[in-house]
Amino acid sequence: MSLTVPPALLEQAQQGAISEEDFLACVRTSLPYAWSVVAGTAEKLNANGGTVEINDDVPQNDKEWGQLFRMMASDSIRAAIERKFGVRLAFQNCCKVAAFAPDATAAYDEFTSMRAQVLNQRPELVDC
């Protein structure tokens, strides 16, 4: 399971639409490690006014790995976070999270290229 959904939010979803604010609160509570990585990366980008901010800290345990994988693999979670922070996210090498300014198309395209994926392989992360 990706998220620990409070009963009230589940009931709301069963009846219709939910607010993005409530959804993000559920994400933040359910995936605290992943939230801290992604939010921190996005906040640094926005504070610096640059085009890209990369966090390549390696998670310390399986729980942290799992949270990061679940967050970055979910289109709805990633899209909601992108809207909240006004960034575009990308993920590489099972732990490298990047936040891009919305207009940083060239940097995003390079980071998400096959070439960049090959160049960023690390032997210690083969089985991450």
Question: Where are the regions that the model predicts?
Answer:
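Fe(II)/2-oxoglutarate oxygenase catalytic core
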Residues: 1-128
